[in-house]
Amino acid sequence: MASFMKQLSLVLSFIALALAGCAVYQNTQTAMKDQLKVTPTWLDNTLKSTNLLSLGLGKPSGGKLGDEACVFSAVKEVVVAAINAEARMGASLIRLFFHDCFVDGCDAGLLLNDTATFTGEQTAAGNNNSVRGFAVIEQAKQNVKTQMPDMSVSCADILSIAARDSFEKFSGSTYTVTLGRKDARTANFTGANTQLVGPNENLTSQLTKFAAKGFNGTEMVALLGSHTIGFARCPLLCISTFINPARVSTLNCNCSGTVNATGLVGLDPTPTTWDQRYFSDVVNDQGLLFSDNELLKGNTTNAAVRRYRDAMGAFLTDFAAAMVKMSNLPPSPGVALEIRDVCSRVNANSVDPCEESRLLASPD
């Protein structure tokens, strides 16, 4: 009988992995490890806890859903660890996602290093010495490959998941990310210089650039609400056209002397807490960036700022919806696409494992 139960447990382990993915598989393995009896009651409870019964045991889509669940789990594992090690990383990953998708769609073009045939986007004005989190995305990519070697997931997908997980980690809210994006085989340095919104842009310019991507003024304000977390670097803030003049005296950057090159200033006074303080500051003329305070100059944007200041639920809902919309911005027509083996370069005939290890170990 004991031998039969052991065999049954092994069979259930493989069935569970194929049909329900990570959750049932891990529960089954725990039962085996702890030498629990695999009874009909135990199996029924396990299936119910993972919603397998609602999927239908015979549906072929169960395997795909399980695979995708494992992908999401593998990415979240890396993202959460990175944020736990450095809270600033959450805002950095959201910004990395935004700066990628806003230039020619979500194609991971921003992740590409310069090559002999093109200049990447990382040294464009809005990105240079600013965007970060590349190593986290590379590590998440490797974790997916390790845990799901037969699952091909693009760097663009991983970046989209990482941004969602960062939002979830800080806000406690979430939204759905679908898979299926592909990675560009080139980057657009010129596009990064012209399409991204800078901290010195007036309201008209901001609205024009967001409208070009299909976003209205309210959606723009919701997305800019991500400034509720994160920091700005002193070298940027010491550029007079980038900062709200009312905030100059609050900085500790030594802008009149030798600028504190490594100094950071919170985008709002609570830069590691997802709250409504950003909107309160904008209403009170205390937004850090020039572009932040411009939001009060339009009827629609002014109303949105005040609404989100007063209603966290509305802010979370609208931000999530705008992020879903952002994540679905398509690559430019005609751009060659692939699923990269390493996020920082286009595919070759093979990937040098030593080079891949070096890339994964390198700092941002």
From Swiss-Prot:
It comes from the Eukaryota. Disulfide bonds join 101-106, 155-343, 234-255. Ca(2+) 2 binds at residues 228, 268, 270, 275. Its EC number is 1.11.1.7. Pfam families: peroxidase. It catalyses: 2 a phenolic donor + H2O2 = 2 a phenolic radical donor + 2 H2O. The active site is at residue 99. The keyword Oxidoreductase applies. Gene3D superfamilies: 1.10.520.10, Peroxidase, domain 2. Residues 1-20 form the signal peptide. Belongs to the peroxidase family. Classical plant (class III) peroxidase subfamily. This is Anionic peroxidase. It comes from Ipomoea batatas.
